[in-house]
Amino acid sequence: MKSISGLIAFSALMVTSMSVSASEIRVMSGGAPKEVFAQLAPKFEQQTGNKVVFVYDVLTALREKIAAGEKVDVLVMPVPMLDGYVKEGKLRADSQATFGTVGTNVVVKEGAPRPDISTKEKFRAAMLAARSVVHATPGKTPSGTHMGKVMEQLGIADAMAKKVIHRPALEGGVQLVADGQADIGIYPASEVANVKGIAVVGSLPAGIDLNTLYGGATTADTPAGDAAAAFVKFMAAPENRSVWKQSGFDPPGS
C-alpha cells in the first residue's frame, strides 16, 4: 500500500515539475515559413513539453506590433530585418539562426495553360497577356515590394494597374488563382508549395528574381529564454532540413 501511495505521489510530483518547467513560446512570423512550422511545431512541443503560439502577419504589420511593444519571445523574418533588431538591442545575437532561402514562384490554376516565363521579356509578355495577376501588396511584404519594382522595371506598371490584385498569401491571395479569379499568382515558393488547385510554372527569371533568406532569434527580454532559444535551434537543426526543403526553402548559403 505504501509503495502504491509512493508511486502516486512521485507521479504527481513529476506532472507538477513538468508543468512548472514547460513554457509557452510566442512566435511572431511572416507568412513564408507557416507551412514548415505547421509540420515541425507539434514535434517540438512533443519533445519539450513547451507550447508554441504563432502570430502570423505581413512584415509591415509585425514591425508595427513590435514598435507598439507587443510581447513576443521569438521573431522569424528575413535576416536583414533580424540583424536590424539585433543592432537595436531587441534581439539576442547569440540566439540567431538562419533557416533557409525562399525563391519567388509564378503559379496558375491547375490545368490552365502555363505561360513561358523563361526570360524577362517572356515574363513581361505573359503579364500583359494575363487577364488578371495577383501578388502581395507592395510595401507590406518582400515579394509584394519586389513585384511593384519589377512592373516599373519592365515598363508595364501603368498597363498592369487595372489587372493587378494586391493580396498577401496570408489573406487568401493564392486561393484567388485556385478559384480562377486570377490568371497568374506570384508568391514566395513556400506559400504555394502545397496549395491544392494550382500549378507552379516556375521561379521568376534571371534579372528579376527574388530570393529571401529567413531566420529567427529570441527577443532580449523574453521570459521564456531557454525554451525560446531551443525553439530557434530546433527549427534550424539539420534533421529538420528536409521539411524546409519540401516547403520551398533551400538551405542557407545555397
How should these model regions be labeled?
Residues 16-18:
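N-terminal signal peptide c-region/cleavage motif recognized by signal peptidases
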Residues 22-60, 64-71, 79-102, 108-254:
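Exported/periplasmic ABC-transporter solute-binding proteins
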